[in-house]
Amino acid sequence: MATNEQIRDQTLVLMSRYQELITARRFDEWIELWADDAVCEFPFADPGRPSRLTGQAEILDYMKAYPETISIEGVQDLQLHPGLDPHVLVVELTIAGTAAQTGRPYNQQYVIIARARDGKLAHYREYWNPLVSAEAFAR
C-alpha cells in the first residue's frame, strides 16, 4: 500500500504532466490522465457554456474545441500546492493568450482544485475571473 508521501508525489507528477500535455495540445494523451468517470467543473462558466462535464468523452470533446476559442501564448506563475489529503492538489497559474474570435488579450488567472484516484484525475474544479473572460470575448 502506498504511503501518503508516495500518493502526494504521484498527484504532483499527474498534474505536472497534465499541464505539459494540455499546453502542447496533445489531447489524446492528455485525456488518458483522467479516470473514465471523471468530473470536470467550471463554476464560473459563461451562460450557455457547460459548467459540468462527466466522463472522458465529454471532457475531451470540450477541450478539443478550446484552440478555436483561445490562443495560448504561455503559462506563467504555475504553483502546485499539495493538500493535507494526498489525493488533492490546488493549482494556481496565469495564462497569457488571445481570444480567437475578438483578437483581444486573454490574460487569465486560474485556481484549480484537483483530486486524483488510483493515479488518474477523478475530479477537477477550475475557477477564473469571469470579468476577464467577458472583456476578452466581448460578452
Name each model-derived stretch:
Residues D85-I95:
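A short hydrophobic beta-strand element
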Residues L33-P86:
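A solvent-exposed, acidic/Ser-Thr-rich amphipathic alpha-helical stretch
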Residues M1-D36, A138-R139:
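Short, low-complexity N-terminal intrinsically disordered segments enriched in polar/charged residues
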Residues W34-A35, L93-G97, I112, W128:
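Short beta-strand segments enriched in hydrophobic/aromatic residues
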Residues V88, V111-E135:
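Short beta-strand edge/turn micro-motifs at domain boundaries
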Residues G74-V75, P105-I112:
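Short, surface-exposed coil-to-beta transition loops
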Residues G97-N107:
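Short, cysteine-centered beta-strand-loop-beta hairpins and adjacent loop/turn segments enriched
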